[in-house]
C-alpha cells in the first residue's frame, strides 16, 4: 500500500512539474510573423427575393446548391417552443397531402442531399438590449441539375405538409426520445450549459426552451405518456405550422456558384408565394424562471459541471485580447487543473462576444467539488498570470487558428 501511495505522489509531482523551455524549443512552431494579419473573410451579400430578404454566398461548391429557409419564431408563445425542434424533424420526414412519408423519403433521396432543421438566435452587434431574433431553419441541399425538383419538394412541405399519418408521427416521437436519452448520457453538458445561459440572456432562454433541458423534459413526458397526450400534441403541430409557415416570417439563404444562385433566384419565388400571407406579430414569451444553482440527475457515473456569468454588460468592452486569454483559460488552465489533474474527459470555455455571456464547462467529469474549486480560483490565477514572450506567442497562434478555421463552402455560407 505504501508503495502505491508513494508512486501516486511521484506521478502527481511529475504531473505538476512544468515542461522546461529547452524541451519545448525542440518542437517545431510557427511565429506570429508567419500569420496573415488580414486573413480572407467571407461576407454574405444581402438581396431580395419576392419581397423577402435573401442572403447570398457566392462560393465554389462543385455544382451543389445549399438552400436555407429561415422562419422567424418571434410570434411563438413560450408554451410552443419545447415542441419546435420536434416539429422541424417531423415535417422534414412526414410527407405531404400528395406524398406519403415513404414516397417523400424516396424523392428526397433521389433529388436532394438531405433535408434537415435547426434553430438559432441572432443578436445585433452593438445592441445592449436583451433583444434577439429567433430563427427556425430548414436546410436543403441538391445538385444544380435537380434544383427544380428540390424546390418543388420544399414548396410542398411549406404549402401542404400532412399530419394525417399518426402512426408515423408516434414512431418519430419515440425515436427522438430514444436518441435524446442517449445524448443526455454522452453529451449531457449541453443541457447543463443551456440552463446556465438561460439565466443570462433572452437568447439563452430561447435556446433552453428549444434545445435545452426544458425541451428534453417535455419530450420525455410526451413519449412516456403518448397515448393520453397525442391529441394535444397534434394540435400543437398544426398551430406551429399555421404560425410559422407565413410569407412575412420567411428569410432565405443560398450558397453556390453565380449561375446556380441566379437559377435559384429565378425559381424560388414559387416557394415564397406558396406560403400563406398575413402579418407576423412578435410576442414576448413568458419564460419560467430557474434557480441560480441546479443539479440535473441522470444514471451516468460522470457529471458535467457548468458555471457561467455575464462578463461584459456592454459588448463594447470586448476586444480581441480576451480571445487570447480565453485560449489560455481553455487550453492551459482548465486543461491542467480539470482534465489532467481532475480526471475529466474534457473541459472548455463557451463565450459569446455579442452578449458577453461566459461559461466554464467540464465534460464527463468524475469530480464536482474539485472542478468548482478550480472555477472559483480562476480570477486569482488570471491576476497572478505572468507569461513569457514565447508562451504568449504560442497563445496568439492558437487563438488565430481558432478564429480562422478551415471551412468547406457550405459552412462558410
What does each model-identified segment do?
Residues 58, 127-129, 241, 296:
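Residues embedded in well-ordered secondary-structure elements
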Amino acid at each position: 500500500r505504501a508503495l502505491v501511495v508513494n508512486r501516486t505522489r511521484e506521478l502527481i509531482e511529475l504531473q505538476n512539474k512544468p515542461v522546461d523551455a529547452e524541451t519545448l524549443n525542440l518542437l517545431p512552431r510557427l511565429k506570429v510573423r508567419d500569420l496573415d494579419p488580414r486573413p480572407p473573410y467571407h461576407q454574405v451579400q444581402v438581396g431580395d427575393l419576392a419581397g423577402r430578404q435573401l442572403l447570398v454566398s457566392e462560393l465554389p461548391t462543385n455544382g451543389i446548391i445549399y438552400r436555407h429557409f429561415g422562419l422567424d419564431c418571434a410570434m411563438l408563445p413560450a408554451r410552443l417552443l419545447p415542441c419546435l425542434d420536434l416539429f422541424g424533424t417531423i415535417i422534414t420526414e412526414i410527407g405531404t397531402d400528395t406524398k406519403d412519408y415513404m414516397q417523400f423519403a424516396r424523392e428526397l433521396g433521389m433529388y436532394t442531399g438531405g433535408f434537415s432543421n435547426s434553430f438559432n438566435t441572432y443578436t445585433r452587434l452593438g445592441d445592449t438590449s436583451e433583444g434577439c431574433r429567433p430563427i427556425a431553419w430548414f436546410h436543403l441541399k441538391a445538385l444544380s441539375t435537380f434544383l427544380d425538383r428540390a424546390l418543388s419538394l420544399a414548396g410542398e412541405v411549406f404549402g401542404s405538409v400532412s399530419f394525417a399519418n399518426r402512426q408515423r408521427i408516434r414512431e418519430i416521437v419515440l425515436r427522438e426520445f430514444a436518441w435524446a436519452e442517449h445524448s443526455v448520457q454522452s453529451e449531457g453538458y449541453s443541457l447543463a450549459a443551456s440552463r446556465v445561459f438561460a439565466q443570462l440572456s433572452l437568447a439563452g432562454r430561447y435556446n433552453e426552451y428549444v434545445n435545452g433541458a426544458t425541451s428534453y423534459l417535455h419530450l420525455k413526458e410526451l413519449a412516456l405518456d403518448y397515448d393520453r397526450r397525442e391529441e394535444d400534441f397534434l394540435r400543437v403541430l398544426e398551430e406551429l405550422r399555421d404560425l410559422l409557415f407565413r410569407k412575412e416570417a420567411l428569410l432565405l439563404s443560398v450558397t453556390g456558384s453565380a449561375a446556380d444562385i441566379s437559377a435559384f433566384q429565378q425559381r424560388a419565388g414559387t416557394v415564397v408565394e406558396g406560403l400563406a400571407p398575413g402579418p407576423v406579430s412578435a410576442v414576448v414569451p413568458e419564460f419560467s424562471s430557474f434557480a441560480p444553482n441546479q443539479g440535473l440527475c441522470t444514471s451516468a457515473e460522470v457529471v458535467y459541471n457548468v458555471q457561467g456569468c455575464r462578463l461584459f454588460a456592454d459588448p463594447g468592452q470586448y476586444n480581441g485580447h480576451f480571445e487570447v486569454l480565453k485560449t489560455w483559460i481553455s487550453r492551459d488552465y482548465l486543461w491542467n487543473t480539470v482534465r489532467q489533474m481532475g480526471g475529466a474527459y474534457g473541459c472548455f470555455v463557451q463565450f459569446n462576444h455579442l452578449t458577453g455571456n461566459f461559461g466554464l464547462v467540464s465534460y464527463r467529469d468524475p469530480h464536482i467539488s474539485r472542478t468548482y474549486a478550480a472555477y472559483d480560483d480562476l480570477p486569482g490565477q488570471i491576476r497572478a498570470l505572468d507569461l513569457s514572450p514565447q508562451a504568449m506567442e504560442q497563445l496568439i497562434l492558437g487563438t488565430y487558428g481558432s478564429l480562422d478555421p478551415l471551412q468547406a463552402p457550405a459552412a462558410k455560407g
